[in-house]
Amino acid sequence: MPLYSSQPLKIYNSLSGEKENFKPIHEGNVGMYVCGPTVYSNVHLGNVRTFMSFDVIFRYFLHLDYKVRYVRNITDVGHIVDDVDEGEDKIAKKARLEQLEPMEVVQRYTVDFHDILKAFNFLPPSIEPTATGHIIEQIEIIKKIIDTGIGYEANGSVYFDVVKYNETNNYGVLSGRNIEDMLANTRDLDGQSDKRNPQDFALWKKAEPEHIMRWPSPWSDGFPGWHLECTAMSTKYLGNHFDIHGGGMDLKFPHHECEIAQNEACTGQSPVNYWMHTNMLTLNGKKMAKSTGNNILPGEILSGDNTILSKAFSASVTRFFMLQAHYRSILDFSDDAITAAEKGYKRLMEALEALPAIKAGSSSSVDFAAWKQACYDAMNDDFNTPILIAQLFEAVRYINLLKEGKETISAEDLKSFSTAINAFVFDVLGLSDEKAADGNNDKLEGVVNMLIGMRNQARADKNFALSDQIRDQLIALGIQLKDGKEGTSFSI
C-alpha cells in the first residue's frame, strides 16, 4: 500500500486562501509546475529559497510514494525589463551591455543556476523546458486566443484584451484585484500604445530592427510574451488541467493571473487546482537590493567572500537555516541567524552519528511511533518544515537519553526510528552529512593519488601503455590529470 494512502495532506491554496485537502487529479500521480529563473544574471538567494521550498515539496511527494512529474522552466526570452510589455528584453539588454550573443548570456547563467542548485543538493526536475524551445506551441496558443476574440493584433504585436475576457471570466481571481480599480489607477494610454486597454498584456511582440532574438509568426518577426511561455510549457507537459503551480509570491500578479486568463481563454477551464506561493527573503530586516548593497549571492555565502557574514557557511547549513521557516513566512537572513542554525545543524548531525551505537533493549520507554507520526503530521500540514525540525530535535533529545541509559528502545523501534529520522533529514529535507562527505572526499583523494603514483612509476619504467590506461580510465570517471613541474595534480 502506498504511503500517501495513510498520510492525508493539506495544502494552502492561494486561489482560495485556505488550506485544502490534497486530492490529485489522477490518484497516485502529481503534476507540478514551478516558474524557473530568467537567466540574465546570477541566481539570488531569494530565488534559491523559492526553488528549495519546491524541492522539499517534490521530495515529500516522492517520499509518500507518489509518481511526480515536476516541470520547472528556464525563461530564456521574452521577459521584459520591469515586467511590463514596453521596453527591452532582460536577456537582450544584458547581451548588449556585455557585448555578448544572447545565447551566451543564457548559457552562462543557466550553468550558474544549475551549479548553485547542485551545491544546495536539489533534486533535478522531471523536465526543464526552455521558452525558446517552445515557440511553435506558443504561436498555436495565440491563434486560439485570437479565434475567441480575446486576442487582437496591432501593428505586428498581439495583445490579450482583459476587459473582454472579464465579461465572462474573472481577471483578478488569484490576486484578489478588481479590474475596474486596476483600470482606474492606470494612466490613460493617450494614443501612445497599440493596446486597447492599459491592463492588456502582450502575447506576441513585434521585434524592433535591432532586436536579435526573433522568430517568424503570422503577425511579425518577433518574440513571445513572458506570461505565454509558462502557459505553453506547463500545458504541454502536464495537460490543460494539472495539480500544482508554484512560484514566488511576487509572481502572483501579473504573471500567474495572466497564465490563468490565457488558459481559460484557450481551453475554457481553470488550469490548476492548487496555486502555491513562497514568501520573500530579507537581509538584516531589509529587502535585498543590489542597488543599496544589501545583497548577498549564494556563492558568496559558501566562499565567505562578502561583507555581510563573519565567515563562510556550508550549503547544508544554509539549507537547514532556510527550512527553519515555513515557506509562506518571510525569512530574515543575518549573520546571527545562520550562526545559530549552524549550531543546530551540528547538534542534529552529531546525534545521527551516535545513533548506530545505540543498543536495543527488550522494550521501549518512549512512544516512538507517535514521534514518527508527529513528523508526518508536520509535513502533512502544508509542508511545515519548522515543525518537522522541532520534532527532529525532540529525536535528538531521545538519542541523548538513550546514550545515557535514561530511556530504552526495542530492536524493532530502533530500526523504525533510525529509518524514519534518516528519511526525514536526508530524503525529505535534503540535508547532507558533511563530515561523511568530507571523509569520502579524503578517501577519493587517497585513491587517486595512489593511482597517480602507479602512473608515475609506469612512466619511469617506460610502460607507457599502463600509464595511458590509468590516465584514460580516470578521465572516463571525470577525473582530469594535469602534469606540471611540481608533479601531477588532479581535478574533478
From Swiss-Prot:
Binding site for Zn(2+): C35, C230, H255, E259
Keywords tagged on the record: Aminoacyl-tRNA synthetase, ATP-binding, Cytoplasm, Ligase, Metal-binding, Nucleotide-binding, Protein biosynthesis, Zinc
Example of a GO MF term: zinc ion binding
Pfam families hit by this protein: DALR_2 (PF09190), tRNA-synt_1e (PF01406)
Reactions it catalyzes: tRNA(Cys) + L-cysteine + ATP = L-cysteinyl-tRNA(Cys) + AMP + diphosphate
Cofactor note: Binds 1 zinc ion per subunit.
Cofactor(s) demanded: Zn(2+)
SMART domains (alphabetical): DALR_2
Residue ranges of the motif 'HIGH' region: 37-47
Gene Ontology cellular component annotations, sorted alphabetically: cytosol
Residue numbers covered by motif 'KMSKS' region: 287-291
Compartment annotation: Cytoplasm
EC number: 6.1.1.16
Matches recorded under InterPro entries: Cys-tRNA-ligase, Cys-tRNA-synt_Ia_DALR, Cys-tRNA/MSH_ligase, Rossmann-like_a/b/a_fold, tRNA-synt_1_cat_dom, tRNAsynth_Ia_anticodon-bd
Binding site for ATP: K290
Record GO biological process: cysteinyl-tRNA aminoacylation
Complexes and interactors: Monomer.
HAMAP family linked to this entry: Cys_tRNA_synth
Family: Belongs to the class-I aminoacyl-tRNA synthetase family.
Protein name: Cysteine--tRNA ligase
GN (gene name): cysS
